[in-house]
Structures are given as C-alpha cells and as structure tokens.
Amino acid sequence: MEPNSLRTKVPAFLSDLGKATLRGIRKCPRCGTYNGTRGLSCKNKTCGTIFRYGARKQPSVEAVKIITGSDLQVYSVRQRDRGPDYRCFVELGVSETTIQTVDGTIITQLSSGRCYVPSCLKAATQGVVENQCQHIKLAVNCQAEATPLTLKSSVLNAMQASPETKQTIWQLATEPTGPLVQRITKNILVVKCKASQKHSLGYLHTSFVQKISAKSLPERRFFCSCQTLKSHKSNASKDEVAQRCIHFFACICAFASDETLAQEFSDFLNFDSSGLKEIIVPQLGCHSESTVSACESTASKSKKRRKDEVSGAQRNSSPLPQDAVSSNLRKSGLKKPVVASSLKRQACGQLLDEAQVTLSFQDWLASVTERIHQTMHYQFDGKPEPLVFHIPQSFFDALQQRISIGSAKKRLPNSTTAFVRKDALPLGTFSKYTWHITNILQVKQILDTPEMPLEITRSFIQNRDGTYELFKCPKVEVESIAETYGRIEKQPVLRPLELKTFLKVGNTSPDQKEPTPFIIEWIPDILPQSKIGELRIKFEYGHHRNGHVAEYQDHRPALDQPLELAPLTTITFP
C-alpha cells in the first residue's frame, strides 16, 4: 500500500465529521502563525506577540493608593458590580470629635471616608447608609500603591499637538500634587486633571485596551472618564481622532518616555491613522540621518513616502527634505576634501585616523576626579561653584550604575524637578534628577579610577607671599640598618606647617545635625539630537590647620597693593 493512501485513509468513526474548520485556532495578526485560542502569546519565537495576560489577578488590584504628594489619601477602588475595568475614587481622612464626660472633655480622632460613586454619594447625603460602603472598606484595607510614570520634556516637545495642549500637560506635570500619570492595573491609569464638579479630586481614570480578533483587524480602544466611550479602530474617522482629550496625550507621552512601556503600548504609539509616529520617533532614536540613509537605499517612491511620513515630526525644527539635502551635501562634499586633507597629512608626515580617536568612560571619569582635586584648594573658601560637564547619555548610565553599587535595585534620585529655562540657552522645559550622597566611602567608590583615585584630603604649604601650593610628600624607602649598627633612636620627623583640605560629606563635626551631601544633578537631552545631557556636581570642602578644623581666611594678596621695588642707584662707567 502506498504512503499516500495511508495519509488519506480516515477511521470509520471520523468519516462523518464534515469539512475541516478553524475552530479552536486563530491566526496571529502580526506573523500569521496559527495558535490556539487559549494561548497567551504567539508560539512563533521571532514574533512573540502577547494576546492576553494570565487570568490570575493580584489581590491588590481591588484598591490602589494614589500618590498625591500631600496628606490627602485618595484610592482607586474597583466597582465589583460593574466589571473589572470600572473604578471609582475613595477619599479617606481623619476627623476630630469631642466627647463630654464627667472628668472633662475628651478629643478623639475618627477615621472618615467619602466614596465618589454617584449612588454611594447620594445614599450618604440622604443618610440611608449607616455603615461604610464596600468601596471605603476596600480602601481602608488597601496596601498597594500606584506606580508613577515619568514624562520627558523632549518627548513632550516632539509631540504633534497644539502649544496649548503641551503647556497644559506641562503645568499639570509640574504641580506638586503627585505624578501626572500613575499606573493602577495593566490597562487602567490615573491622570491628573483640573478640578471640576465632575472630578472634584483633580484625578480621573483612563484605560487602554486592545482586542485581537482573527476575523477583523486589531481593535484599539481608549476610554477616558472625561468623555464618552470611543472605539479607535483602524477605520475611525478623522473627526474622532482629532477630538482626543488632553489626558490621552499625557498617557502617550508617559509611554514614549519609557522603553518598556513604549514596547508594551507600541500598537497605540505606532497607530497610523492617529498621527502618533511623531511621538515615538525621538524616543527610539530614529534620527534624520538614519532615516535619510534608509531612504537613499530605496526607490524614489518609497523615498517620497517616507519623507511624507516623518515630515510632521520635523515640522517644529526643520523639514526633512532640507535635512536630506544638507546630509547629501555633506556626504558629497566630503569626497573631494578628503583627498586634499590626506595630501596635507602625508606632506606633514602626520597620519591620524579619526575613527580611532575615542574617549572611554574611565578616562572621562578620571578627568572629573582631577577637576575635583583642583577645586579643593586651600587658598579658596570651601563652597565652590558647581562643576558642569556635558556628556552623552551612555556615560551617565555608567555613572548611575556606580551610584547604585551595593544595592539590589537601581537607586532612584532623591528629587526630580521640572523647570522652564527662559533666560539662557538652550530654551525649553527640562527635567532635573538629583542624587544626594552622604557617605564619603560611597563617593570614593563612585569616582575612583585606576588612573586617578579620589583624594579625600589634599596637603598644601604656604608661601612667603601668602599663597598656597600643593604639597606632595615624597615617598622614601628607608633601609633597616638597626641590625648592623644597633638600635638608633628615632628622631621626630620635621614637617612643615600642616595645611589640608578635606571633602565635607556626611557629619564632619560632633555638633552637626544634618549631613553634608555630595550632590549629583543630571539634566538629560540638553542637546536632544546628539543625546547629550548636563551633569552638575556640587560639594563642599573644609580646611585643616595642624590637624584641627580651621575657618577659612582670605590670605590672597590684594591686587591693588603696590609692588615693593628696590631703590634705583646710579651706575658710573669708566
């Protein structure tokens, strides 16, 4: 019997099944691989599309505490009777009550709560419900806290939105009432808003949901409690797209400011009909140079199409065709000068490969340490100006890794502030992250390099004119001659007047209450296209005189003092 007949032969009990169907399987919308309907992700390893997350839910999702930045306790609580995506706000507080007794008046504190579900509010005002509602009970037992999401000013500036929208988002982000966007669950977020009659707490819920179907295109749905439910499908009208609320753009900026979130919500960020490609372009590093090189390698039609796609992203700075022309001019202009420059180099006998000229992170860090050494001079007071460095983002990532040494997780900054620079270049809105180091050993661990170890103290000697210069104690190897000539009494070593400076980090005196910090400030994206940020180092140092702490005294000679010249004499020549 032939092998084909074996394949086509069907058992008798399966002969009446009829035509095969696709029941129980579905096609991946990205790669087209067939997967089971119960599968959580695509079995194609190169695709890795996640269809849905596991049904197992954490108990903390029922109630989540919101970060408000004040004593106000606000909770996001799930409404069990409506569904998993319906949530409400609950406010908890403490009220004082006086009780008159025989012994006197007793003041007690009672915990009070207010649920903002319309039915609960109505029942509370009418006095129908005597006990607490189920939402307040969930908030009282809550132990989970929302996850704050960062927002980068560079992403906000690159977003294709009106200036009023950007200004409103930045004003909400810089208010001291907690983060702008906080994540409650996988799909639900809490966004700050302007307090109104509908949202009296100044917060509202938003949700991002994506439904994948084998028969139709993926359906992306965004819902905000400030408006009615809208389904943003691929065939959504332009009017619906244009009517997005400000809270949608705030969430999109938060997604684009984080690599993990940008990958998770990439379907919303890369949604063609929404014009959101401009938002994610600066975050993923798709600069104009890489876009131009990709366009040059394709046909003219694809080149024109790609220019049209990214022209909106470059509208605020410079149009892409100009960038393409300038880059082409640079490339074409580099061909002839290279020959001339190579001839000049050969004539001079100096051949230097520019590609081999590099600066490692440790070499740069050694220069930072050396500059700190130069700043710790005895001749000046112990409060120098901040040291400013402009470095690439990769250098700061390596420095932040040194800051986090010794801890299991990445050390977060002590403070994060946003500011608007109007009186100096570059202009715009920036974020500043500040770390306070109060352990001198940790400072040394951060700045030590094999080429330049950090010197916590520096020795100086005083000159006759009142100035100071660095004193390096010579290292002399002393031979042991006591065995040959017997014991020799050790004479005390004659040392000059001991003048030292020392880094002030932590508590340097017994009566000091607050430790002196070694401050590291980082402002990313000062040069957004080059990915260059600004690093500021602030520190203080003290003065030692013969082992004792001495107050700084300005011994520098005054510039207006007359120079003492020897009297002129008459010289006679024979």
From Swiss-Prot:
Biased composition (Polar residues): 313-327
InterPro entries given in the database record: C2orf42, Zf-tcix
Entry GO terms, CC: nucleoplasm
Region of interest (Disordered), ranges: 297-327
Pfam families, sorted: zf-tcix
Cystine crosslinks: none
Lineage top rank: taxon: Eukaryota
PANTHER family in the record: C2ORF42 HOMOLOG, PUTATIVE TREBLE-CLEF ZINC-FINGER C2ORF42 FAMILY MEMBER
Protein name, UniProt field: Uncharacterized protein C2orf42 homolog
